[in-house]
A protein has these predicted regions:
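Flexible "arm" and connector segments at domain edges
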Residues: 1-62, 66-104
């Protein structure tokens, strides 16, 4: 099946459900360690795309890294919306938005 881009927006909860439905069986077979290694590899590809300053490649690689991080979260039972919620009201350290932490 060829990739298609859409303008559809997904909540983190919806993303986790779709990643689970699409890749969950393979992720469980690969295990946490193997899936984590794939995520690390994708983060490396994000770094390469950043250095190349290629917006299309960067979007692609960030999408891949997000999908693999979502797989890791699914395997270890982390709800990404709950994990991200600590940033809703600003910086979790100083409580401000924008952040006013020293050295940040």
């Amino acid at each position: 099946m060829k990739h298609r881009e859409t303008e559809a927006r997904l909540s983190l909860h919806e993303l986790q459900a779709r990643i689970e439905a699409t890749f969950g069986e393979r992720d469980r077979a690969r295990g946490v360690d193997g899936t984590f290694r794939w995520w690390v590899e994708e983060v490396g590809e994000v770094a390469k795309a950043l250095r190349a300053r290629d917006p299309a490649e960067l979007q692609h690689e960030i999408g891949d890294a997000l999908a693999w991080l979502t797989s890791v979260a699914n395997l270890v039972g982390v709800d990404l919306e709950r994990a991200a919620s600590r940033f809703v009201d600003g910086c979790p350290r100083c409580g401000n938005s924008p952040c006013t932490c020293p050295g940040a």
